[in-house]
Amino acid sequence: ALIFSLTSCSLDGGADESTEEMGNSMSSADREYLNVSDNIGSEPVIGKPDGIAPTQLVSRDIVVGTGTQVVSTSTLTVHYVLISWATGEVLQSSWSGAPAVFPLSGVIQGWQQGMPGMKAGGRRLLVIPPELAYGASGSGPIGPNETLAFVVDVVSVD
């Protein structure tokens, strides 16, 4: 499998999180979607997607956070990497600058459905089919009918 080597960055306030709870690491069933490093607070290392893209939303915790839980009305501060399922290419990443801040209600349906329940301090994989993302029109570097994979670190929840 091809692994992208990404530059590591420190995240202010990044404390060591407990890794004793179940669900902190991806199971072998989850790894069929995508290999993602669990180095919370640093830019994730992401393997190239393998196989046919899922047709349903995939929302899997890689690291379970211990902070405030995301709800539909939350404003999130996150670091994320977005890759194309088809090519494995990184399309966007917040890791080269400050974390992104936005209301969950203002983003694509895949995030609105896949982020609630996550806790600050965690890392989650979202694999989002086109109908919950940008559909047939695409957007910027995102092609039409493209399945997207996001790796999201929640820094804080307001």
Predicted regions and their residues:
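Cross-family detector of peptidyl-prolyl cis-trans isomerase
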Residues: 1-158
